[in-house]
């Protein structure tokens, strides 16, 4: 894995864990554990696979972040 790819994956890993902050505690712990296992298992994956792996996790993180943004927006309105 190139150093540029490594930085991308590490940044994504941190982003996903940060996005779990909005989840209830029990789901956060479950999600964090799952993310750690997934990223650890795919440490040695080929470049082609890493691209798809990152795309899927970026989509997941974006989804959680949009839900958080929506939730914060709803709180500010009411």
PLM features per residue range, with description:
Residues 1-78:
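Intrinsically disordered, low-complexity, basic-enriched segments
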């Amino acid at each position: 894995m190139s150093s540029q790819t490594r930085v991308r994956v590490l940044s994504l890993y941190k982003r996903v864990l940060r996005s779990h902050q909005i989840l209830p505690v029990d789901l956060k712990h479950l999600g964090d554990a799952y993310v750690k296992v997934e990223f650890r298992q795919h440490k040695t994956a080929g470049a082609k696979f890493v691209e798809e792996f990152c795309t899927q996790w970026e989509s997941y993180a974006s989804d959680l972040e949009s839900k958080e943004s929506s939730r914060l927006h709803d709180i500010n309105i009411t």
